[in-house]
Amino acid sequence: MGIVYQKALEFKQKYPMTVGWRLKKNSEVIERHLNPGEKVLYVFVAQKNDNPLDIISTAVVALTNERILIGRKRVVMGYFLDSITPDMFNDLTIKQGPIWGKVIIDTVKEEVILSNIDRNALAEIDDNITMTMIEEKKEYGRDLETKKKDK
């Protein structure tokens, strides 16, 4: 059992109202694309869409020390993988409804909407993503300054 799948199961057990299916297959997509030395810090499950009635777009979202990975295994063949690096990350919006909540990740290119998340998990997701991205952006800025000095 991979670390991403294990953490996805822990999240699902802690927040059972979150809608999510095929966690093992979706987790395998992320594990296939982890870089050597990349550490998985936090994992959660959501639907990658904006429609609360569409419950077949389950994604496993992994926050690593380098980026955010969103993995979805297709039913027949292939998969989808989204990678959001700290330099592409702009903002995070949390929306809470009566049953579920949404996490909206604003990037340079698009808005990534993750829905049907147990409303009790929203604060934990916000804390993990925000704190990690702030730290990684600082590190990314230091790397850019070092490269400029080297030129």
Question: What are the residue ranges of the model-derived segments?
Answer:
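Polybasic phosphoinositide-binding surfaces of eukaryotic membrane-targeting domains
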Residues: 56-70
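Secretory/extracellular carbohydrate-interaction modules
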Residues: 33, 37
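The phosphoinositide-binding surface of pleckstrin homology
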Residues: 38-53
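Acidic, Ser/Thr- and proline-rich intrinsically disordered linker/docking segments
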Residues: 1-16, 20-22, 29-32, 53-54, ...
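A sequence-composition feature that detects small, non-aromatic residues
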Residues: 8, 46, 59-62, 121-123
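Short glycine-rich, polar/acidic loop-and-turn segments at beta strand-coil junctions
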Residues: 44-48, 67, 74
